[in-house]
Amino acid sequence: MKRFAILTLISLFCIGCSQPKLLENQELKQQDRYLKVINGQNPIYLDKSSIRVNSDNSNELSYYLITNISSSEQALKGTSMKKLTKVNCADKTTILSANNQFEVYTQFFAQGEKLFDIPEKAEKIEMQNTSLLSLISATVCQYAGKKFGEKENALIEMQKNLEKQSETKH
């Protein structure tokens, strides 16, 4: 009986390891949960706890980008916008506004009450060059343990390319 229980547990563990999984909705400290990807008056953050693996395609991840509004119209100051984004790590494509909308909240980091949605057409982008979007996408893929464009160290390579570009400009 003990042997049967142990074999059953091992089998369930092995089956569980082979299934594509969602990343756990981790309770991260605020400073660990959000990665600032764009500085400025209205900084944009990657919500690392929102990264999910598509159950139909393990190379496809979804995540939220959050913009904290600290400038512009007084009515919007102190609010935030949340945008669902998807990335296919294998073929380096991203879909911005995957759910065709921005969600606007009363507080920073998509906290507080949801005020309204702003419709926005989803846009598919194929990333061939090093750009801010490709850096964000590679970061998401790396965080989820996926290769970006089938390259193990894609993020490091892109950072080196950016360093070379900035050296040639000076």
Map each language-model feature to its residues.
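Phosphate/pyrophosphate-binding loop motifs in nucleotide- or prenyl diphosphate-using proteins
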Residues: 2-5, 85
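N-terminal secretory-pathway/extracellular module detecting exported/lumenal segments
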Residues: 18-83, 88-170
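Generic signature of intrinsically disordered, low-complexity, basic-rich segments
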Residues: 1, 14-16, 150
